[in-house]
């Protein structure tokens, strides 16, 4: 059996950070593993039915290193559903599953749980953010998994217990310390950000944009892959703020600022405007922006460069600077997806789809022109090959640990540099 060889490969990947001299051996192991694991047609069909992880829910290092594939509503995933005491059950469900079906699966699990001696009555499904905000789903809601925020979790409880739901402890507490990012080069991190963005973005079909804009939340067919791209944008923004605010050393914070500005520049150079603007907006987070001593330690060259980046992110005059940049670039490129959706939504809501019984073709052409950029981007293949020497960075970039509670981020900021400093 070739299973032990794969296990050896995974162990070697985990040891790369401590033993970089293993790079060539890991490369050979990877090649042999790929050869031995080359699937037959029957195996390929079977893999389509396997349970697949969302990118924020990786549990094993080999899962996060696999290339991303487009999600369909029929795909199955594992998901944790928590109870008010923070115990949880793990369910296996289709992505398009209705909330009523999810609750039925949860009830079945709780029935055999030792932690639940009494079977609960009427259950509801709730999304709880790290800030404690709650959103109750309707039994008819579908495909709720991809709508969750970065650190949002699913809870189930009886209606009378709704107000008792609290975020998980790990979402409201933080531990200061040095980041793994200090040991990684800006080039490696930027390259892996771009690679992952391309994998996610290439999974999005143009129809998902049309569905998102024309149907919104009322659509029975959710734009699953597009929602994951939007989540990734939010995740990268909060990652930047989290890394800087967890760093207790002033000189190291300055180093992180320099590194993030360099990462943004490299993403822009590779025409990944999604991560480029996400990093810039992360540095513009009020909790980071107020760190006067940290920003004063930044060399003038980097401050000037960041000011140029800020001007591109400036929303004034209908994002003119960003639009000028887009016009100057040639595909393939990854646009800043939230702004693209904003443009499509504005065009849809400001123009009627029909004039009497006639279709407004002018509106359709304008919508087509906006989505044409996506089509061209998908047509051109990107050279995104990576070597095993970057596997640790690759795993890190695909499993970002972030704090998305703005109040907590601001408290961390004030502890680093109190208001009177």
Tell what function each PLM region has.
Residues 37, 122, 151, 191, ...:
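Detector for Asparagine
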Residues 1-7, 209-335:
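Core of folded catalytic or high-affinity ligand/protein-binding domains
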Residues 17, 111-112, 269, 289, ...:
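A generic secondary-structure boundary signal that marks alpha-helix termini
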Residues 2-72, 104, 295-421:
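Intrinsically disordered, proline- and charge-rich regulatory regions
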Residues 3-228, 234, 239-246:
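Intrinsically disordered, Pro/Ser/Thr-rich cytosolic linker and juxtamembrane tail regions that serve as
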């Amino acid at each position: 059996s070739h299973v032990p060889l794969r296990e050896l490969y995974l162990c070697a990947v985990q040891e790369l950070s401590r033993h970089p001299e293993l790079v060539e051996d890991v490369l050979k192991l990877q090649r042999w593993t790929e050869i031995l694991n080359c699937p037959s047609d029957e195996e390929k069909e079977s893999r389509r039915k396997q349970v697949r992880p969302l990118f924020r829910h990786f549990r094993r290092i080999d899962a996060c290193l696999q290339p991303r594939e487009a999600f369909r509503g029929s795909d199955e995933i594992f998901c944790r559903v928590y109870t008010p005491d923070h115990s949880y059950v793990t369910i296996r469900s289709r992505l398009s599953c209705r909330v009523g079906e999810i609750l039925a699966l949860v009830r079945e699990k709780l029935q055999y749980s030792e932690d639940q001696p009494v079977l609960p009555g009427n259950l509801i499904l709730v999304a709880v953010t790290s800030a404690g905000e709650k959103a109750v789903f309707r039994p008819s809601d579908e495909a709720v998994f991809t709508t969750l925020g970065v650190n949002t979790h699913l809870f189930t409880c009886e209606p009378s217990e709704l107000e008792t739901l609290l975020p998980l402890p790990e979402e409201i507490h933080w531990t200061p310390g040095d980041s793994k990012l200090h040991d990684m080069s800006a080039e490696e991190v930027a390259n892996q950000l771009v690679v992952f963005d391309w994998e996610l973005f290439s999974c999005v079909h143009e129809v998902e944009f049309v569905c998102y804009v024309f149907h919104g939340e009322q659509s029975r067919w959710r734009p699953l892959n597009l929602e994951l791209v939007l989540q990734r944008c939010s995740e990268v923004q909060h990652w930047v703020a989290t890394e800087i605010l967890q760093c207790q050393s002033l000189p190291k914070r300055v180093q992180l600022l320099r590194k993030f500005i360099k990462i943004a520049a490299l993403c822009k150079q590779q025409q990944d405007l999604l991560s480029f603007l996400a990093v810039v907006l992360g540095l513009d987070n009020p909790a980071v922006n107020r760190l006067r001593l940290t920003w004063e330690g930044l060399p003038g060259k980097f401050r000037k460069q960041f000011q140029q980046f800020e001007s591109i992110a400036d929303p004034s005059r209908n994002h003119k600077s960003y639009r000028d940049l887009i016009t100057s670039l040639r595909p393939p490129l990854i646009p800043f997806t939230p702004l693209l959706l904003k443009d499509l939504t504005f065009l849809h809501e400001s123009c009627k789809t029909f004039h009497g019984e006639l279709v407004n073709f002018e509106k359709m052409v304008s919508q087509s022109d906006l989505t044409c950029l996506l089509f061209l981007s998908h047509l051109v293949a990107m050279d995104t090959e990576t070597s095993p020497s970057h596997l640790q960075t690759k795993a890190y970039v695909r499993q970002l640990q972030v704090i998305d509670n703005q109040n907590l981020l601001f408290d961390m900021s004030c502890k680093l540099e109190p208001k009177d400093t």
